[in-house]
Amino acid sequence: MSERLFVLSQHILPKLALTRLAGRFADWKGGGITTAAIRRFIARYNVDMGEAADSDPAAYATFNDFFTRALKPGVRPVADARLVCPVDGAVSQLGAIDSGRIFQAKGRDYSATALLAGDADLAARFADGHFATIYLSPRDYHRIHMPCAGRLLEMTYVPGDLYSVNPATARGVDRLFARNERVVCVFEDEQSQPFVMVLVGATIVGSMATVWHGVVNPPRRPAVEKWDYRGQDIRLAKGEEMGRFLLGSTVVLLYPAGPLKFNPQWQAASPVRMGEAMAS
């Protein structure tokens, strides 16, 4: 299928119905059928099970257990850097936020305000800051970790579309990350500077979860919902798990204006691993 036809199909497919169906299957304890499906998935996507804490496909009761598998201790060392990569995946884009606009792909951008569910005051804090967008493929490790130490301030669930998230849709779907379902997590670092981690949903991404809340979706809510954690003193260390995707999608990171130098090896489409140096 050509890229143009694939993008066109994204406007036609019953994305929510497909995602709900996939979510039910992913939670199903199918015994030998589930194990066979996991083995096929491993072969299809060349998943490196040698890194998994449990490499036996039969050890996973459900697809969700497999998707969110833990890694062996020590296989993702956390670099001594100001910011480290929060996930395994590939760089979609990164760079400067230009007067509140975030680059998506050639000829396409979107506003930080739209990404942050219309919160103009929060978006203004990143108007000329920095961003990094990282895509997780189906073969990747699906847990999300902290790029630096942080204290949780708030979380917002944003209902939206469920377009597939990959390089083709980034090039072909306008404002992709600001229109898909997402979870916006706002932190402050040890210097009391804000930073944001946006977990972006997609077709067949059955749910997103955080370590402090558990599963955020489903259920899928019809309106924006916000939780304030300022009074709970929830602190996470650099490299500590903060959430997870079921299957895979994208994380968008926002940082305020100021000196920040991304790893020069990071370019669009560069493969990255959780814990490696992201910025200094």
Swiss-Prot record:
Is synthesized initially as an inactive proenzyme. Formation of the active enzyme involves a self-maturation process in which the active site pyruvoyl group is generated from an internal serine residue via an autocatalytic post-translational modification. Two non-identical subunits are generated from the proenzyme in this reaction, and the pyruvate is formed at the N-terminus of the alpha chain, which is derived from the carboxyl end of the proenzyme. The keyword Nuclease does not apply. This is Phosphatidylserine decarboxylase proenzyme. It catalyses: a 1,2-diacyl-sn-glycero-3-phospho-L-serine + H(+) = a 1,2-diacyl-sn-glycero-3-phosphoethanolamine + CO2. Pfam families: PS_Dcarbxylase. Coiled coil: none annotated. It comes from the Bacteria. It comes from Chromobacterium violaceum (strain ATCC 12472 / DSM 30191 / JCM 1249 / CCUG 213 / NBRC 12614 / NCIMB 9131 / NCTC 9757 / MK). Pathway: Phospholipid metabolism; phosphatidylethanolamine biosynthesis; phosphatidylethanolamine from CDP-diacylglycerol: step 2/2. Keywords: Cell membrane, Decarboxylase, Lipid biosynthesis, Lipid metabolism, Lyase, Membrane, Phospholipid biosynthesis, Phospholipid metabolism, Pyruvate, Zymogen. The active site is at residues 88, 145, 249. Binds 1 pyruvoyl group covalently per subunit. Its EC number is 4.1.1.65. The modification Pyruvic acid (Ser) is found at residue 249. GO terms for biological process: phosphatidylethanolamine biosynthetic process. One of its GO terms (molecular function) is phosphatidylserine decarboxylase activity. Heterodimer of a large membrane-associated beta subunit and a small pyruvoyl-containing alpha subunit. Catalyzes the formation of phosphatidylethanolamine (PtdEtn) from phosphatidylserine (PtdSer). Its cofactor is pyruvate. It is a peripheral membrane protein. The gene is psd. It is an enzyme of class 4 (lyase). Belongs to the phosphatidylserine decarboxylase family. PSD-B subfamily. Prokaryotic type I sub-subfamily.
